[in-house]
């Protein structure tokens, strides 16, 4: 499995966004409010779902997203959004 684009843990999934996004993109996300972040669910969330294989092919990451979120029925799309929102929250705290 290509670990670069297919992280197996939730921490790897969030950390990978900090590694692959350029400084300008990080600043754009950091400058968004929680309400504005919702506009990125359909775009960035979809890319995360595809590249992290959350729609199928990466059951370990999906399982961990369910466990950490406390939502056992989380699907691939919801898991991608959860990863995106956690990434955004870390940006807000300056923990990138």
Residue ranges of predicted features:
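N-terminal secretory signal peptides
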Residues: 1-31
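Compact alpha-helical subdomains of small soluble proteins
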Residues: 23-96
């Amino acid at each position: 499995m290509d670990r670069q684009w297919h992280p197996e843990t939730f921490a790897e999934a969030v950390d990978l966004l900090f590694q692959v996004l350029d400084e300008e993109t990080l600043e754009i996300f950091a400058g968004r409010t929680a309400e504005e972040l919702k506009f990125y669910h359909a775009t960035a969330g979809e890319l995360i779902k595809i590249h992290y294989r959350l729609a199928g092919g990466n059951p370990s990451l999906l399982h961990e997203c369910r466990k950490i979120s406390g939502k056992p029925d989380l699907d691939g799309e919801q898991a991608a959004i959860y990863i995106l929102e956690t990434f955004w929250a870390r940006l807000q705290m300056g923990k990138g």
